[in-house]
């Protein structure tokens, strides 16, 4: 029998933290209102996010939106909103995701001040974040205190198994999605039953406009899929973890302080290379898509040279680290160029092109498709990358840092590296594998 009350006591904010959050939030809203009056700005401060909805976990942050009248031009709204943010957070920094905002701290509490437009139910959003105001109102109307604790349990569970967070770092479940799941299914265990008993795409709302792995329509915006950020891997991980928990319930599924197991590195008979690049100072939502482009470019290069990639991992620390594992340590001496089918209009062009080029065989047919073989200089994975990465775009910011790429060979590494820990880790589901036995 799981003692859910003990779990909640462990991760729910205590009275001291709640009082601190209340004091800071009251200061922010009062001060923001004063600034708006003093500068004749037609806007109101509105607390949003998990604290405003009462679904926050301990050590949380505060989100203050500055909601402007809808007749402001968007650029003016952003400029004035950022100005208010800097007044409230003198040491804050401007950040950009879908929308510019100011991020800073007061007394150890992280605070985001975000400009937006006022929005009522049924109105169209003007800026990307306007609907957040309605999310807060909707959740507070639909959830009572006990249900909000069910949201907290779901959040802790998802954090523990590595699927919480809609940001590009995780491609998982947002806090708002957790709240909607509890609103829809009543409690934490019912939500887990949903994940454990469904197969294929999880279409909670069957809307043919969306082809995402999971679909749940936003009740305040019928044109938005709240679950659009959930990747197939995150959905699959949640399904496995839900089955494991329901089969063998354990409080270990709610342990956010669990220390990661240091896996044993071992020779798999494969070629493992770690490519690192300087890390630009960017928000996760801007940085991580570029990291994934970097990894994809490395994998495509390995495929292009028939190196047979079989594994990969990423980690972000002082630099960005991408591990690529291939079956081969060196490329083939023969490279096969795949041409068009014989019955296509460009088949003759392919033949003519290669008849004037150096080759070891061909053009020749296999079935109805043309091929040409060329003799290639044999290269190691790192030689392939360093001589060819320039032809791939890996993102606006990382493209400028390609000259900082460094390579480490697995067989030469002494000590521990976190990206290797991730690669060799047995913690596929937050270290819970043993609980399924």
From Swiss-Prot:
It comes from the Archaea. Catalyzes the addition and repair of the essential 3'-terminal CCA sequence in tRNAs without using a nucleic acid template. Adds these three nucleotides in the order of C, C, and A to the tRNA nucleotide-73, using CTP and ATP as substrates and producing inorganic pyrophosphate. tRNA 3'-terminal CCA addition is required both for tRNA processing and repair. Also involved in tRNA surveillance by mediating tandem CCA addition to generate a CCACCA at the 3' terminus of unstable tRNAs. While stable tRNAs receive only 3'-terminal CCA, unstable tRNAs are marked with CCACCA and rapidly degraded. InterPro entries: CAA_C, CCA-adding_arc, CCA_tRNA_nucleotrans_2, NT_2-5OAS_ClassI-CCAase, NT_sf, NuclTrfase_I-like_C, Polymerase_NTP_transf_dom, tRNA_NucTransf2. One of its GO terms (biological process) is tRNA 3'-terminal CCA addition. Mg(2+) binds at residues 61, 63, 112. It is an enzyme of class 2 (transferase). ATP binds at residues 50, 53, 135, 155, 164. This is CCA-adding enzyme. Its cofactor is Mg(2+). Keywords: ATP-binding, Magnesium, Metal-binding, Nucleotide-binding, Nucleotidyltransferase, RNA repair, RNA-binding, Transferase, tRNA processing. Its EC number is 2.7.7.72. Belongs to the tRNA nucleotidyltransferase/poly(A) polymerase family. Archaeal CCA-adding enzyme subfamily. CTP binds at residues 50, 53, 135, 155, 164. A single active site specifically recognizes both ATP and CTP and is responsible for their addition. It catalyses: a tRNA precursor + 2 CTP + ATP = a tRNA with a 3' CCA end + 3 diphosphate; a tRNA with a 3' CCA end + 2 CTP + ATP = a tRNA with a 3' CCACCA end + 3 diphosphate. GO terms for molecular function: ATP binding; CCA tRNA nucleotidyltransferase activity; magnesium ion binding; tRNA binding. Homodimer.
